[in-house]
Amino acid sequence: MSEFWHKLGCCVVEKPQPKKRRRRIDRTMIGEPMNFVHLTHIGSGEMGAGDGLAMTGAVQEQMRSKGNRDRPWSNSRGL
């Protein structure tokens, strides 16, 4: 049985990760928002401490009904 593990061990070699550096992003690379669609506004008085969770569900449902989720610029996943 040890021969089996020896043969298996020599075939399975961990590949080194490529040394790819990610480009750093600075503020000059970021432009103005494009295709922005304002769906709703939540004021400070609308999200009280007692009803915050219940209100959140209502706002999320309103936002779902407003927009088309198939837009290419939308990267939200399901509010």
UniProtKB/Swiss-Prot annotation:
<dbReference type="InterPro" id="IPR000095">
    <property type="entry name" value="CRIB_dom"/>
</dbReference>
<keyword id="KW-0449">Lipoprotein</keyword>
<feature type="region of interest" description="Disordered">
    <location>
        <begin position="48"/>
        <end position="79"/>
    </location>
</feature>
<dbReference type="GO" id="GO:0005886">
    <property type="term" value="C:plasma membrane"/>
</dbReference>
<dbReference type="GO" id="GO:0005737">
    <property type="term" value="C:cytoplasm"/>
</dbReference>
<dbReference type="GO" id="GO:0005856">
    <property type="term" value="C:cytoskeleton"/>
</dbReference>
<keyword id="KW-0472">Membrane</keyword>
<dbReference type="GO" id="GO:0006909">
    <property type="term" value="P:phagocytosis"/>
</dbReference>
<protein>
    <recommendedName>
        <fullName>CDC42 small effector protein 1</fullName>
    </recommendedName>
</protein>
<dbReference type="InterPro" id="IPR039056">
    <property type="entry name" value="SPEC"/>
</dbReference>
<comment type="function">
    <text>Probably involved in the organization of the actin cytoskeleton by acting downstream of CDC42, inducing actin filament assembly. Alters CDC42-induced cell shape changes. In activated T-cells, may play a role in CDC42-mediated F-actin accumulation at the immunological synapse. May play a role in early contractile events in phagocytosis in macrophages.</text>
</comment>
<keyword id="KW-0564">Palmitate</keyword>
<dbReference type="GO" id="GO:0008360">
    <property type="term" value="P:regulation of cell shape"/>
</dbReference>
<comment type="subunit">
    <text>Interacts with CDC42 (in GTP-bound form). Interacts weakly with RAC1 and not at all with RHOA.</text>
</comment>
<feature type="compositionally biased region" description="Basic and acidic residues">
    <location>
        <begin position="63"/>
        <end position="72"/>
    </location>
</feature>
<feature type="lipid moiety-binding region" description="S-palmitoyl cysteine">
    <location>
        <position position="10"/>
    </location>
</feature>
<feature type="domain" description="CRIB">
    <location>
        <begin position="30"/>
        <end position="43"/>
    </location>
</feature>
<dbReference type="InterPro" id="IPR036936">
    <property type="entry name" value="CRIB_dom_sf"/>
</dbReference>
<feature type="lipid moiety-binding region" description="S-palmitoyl cysteine">
    <location>
        <position position="11"/>
    </location>
</feature>
<keyword id="KW-0133">Cell shape</keyword>
<keyword id="KW-1003">Cell membrane</keyword>
<dbReference type="GO" id="GO:0035023">
    <property type="term" value="P:regulation of Rho protein signal transduction"/>
</dbReference>
<dbReference type="GO" id="GO:0031267">
    <property type="term" value="F:small GTPase binding"/>
</dbReference>
<keyword id="KW-0206">Cytoskeleton</keyword>
<keyword id="KW-0963">Cytoplasm</keyword>
<keyword id="KW-0581">Phagocytosis</keyword>
<comment type="similarity">
    <text>Belongs to the CDC42SE/SPEC family.</text>
</comment>
